[in-house]
Design a protein with these regions (language model features):
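Short histidine
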Residues: 62-64, 71, 91-93
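Residue-level recognition of beta-strand microenvironments
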Residues: 22-24, 68, 85-88
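Short, well-structured beta-strand-loop connectors
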Residues: 51-65, 76, 81-84
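Short glycine-rich, polar/acidic loop-and-turn segments at beta strand-coil junctions
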Residues: 35-37, 69, 78
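Acidic, low-complexity mobile loops and tails
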Residues: 1-61, 94, 98-106, 110-134
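Charged, amphipathic alpha-helical coiled-coil/dimerization segments
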Residues: 79, 83-84, 90-97
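Small beta-strand-rich domains/subdomains or short beta-sheet motifs embedded
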Residues: 14, 48, 66, 72-76
Length: 134
């Protein structure tokens, strides 16, 4: 496992307390699992993503990730409609381990309120939570 200081936290992203990240891309938001979360899970062997067109409320489960250690649920950091899913994750779930902020993204959503992204944690605030053991 990585030490907290080794965790990658891109400054341009926003983070949820549940260890998901959000990147605004125009009027859409790309969502994935943080480097910290993938590191804690260990080798990821299966990912279940939602259906395109599904509307998922903030805080609701949007994906399930299975690793050699455990099965974990991922919680939607902002309400919106799923407009795309990362299909290659189904065949190659280790992408979540190898590239959590790149090829390992999970869903692309059209947020109900794009301004809600500003309510999520900055990289600095997320790191502070991690150091606090949350």
């Amino acid at each position: 496992m990585k030490r907290i200081e080794e965790i990658q936290l891109p400054e341009e992203l926003r983070y949820s307390p549940d260890h998901e990240w959000v990147r605004l891309e125009g009027d859409l938001a790309r969502v994935g699992l943080t480097d910290y979360a993938q590191d804690q899970l260990g080798d990821i062997v299966y990912v279940e993503l939602p259906s395109i067109g599904a509307h998922i409320a903030q805080g609701a489960v949007f994906a399930t990730v299975e690793s050699v250690k455990s099965v974990s649920e991922c919680f939607m950091p902002l309400s919106g409609e799923v407009v795309a899913v990362n299909g290659p994750l189904s065949d190659n779930p280790v992408l979540l381990n190898q590239s959590p902020y790149g090829d390992g993204w999970m869903v692309l959503v059209k947020p109900d309120d794009p301004a809600a992204v500003s309510q999520l944690l900055t990289a600095e605030a997320y790191l502070t939570r991690l150091k606090g053991g949350v």
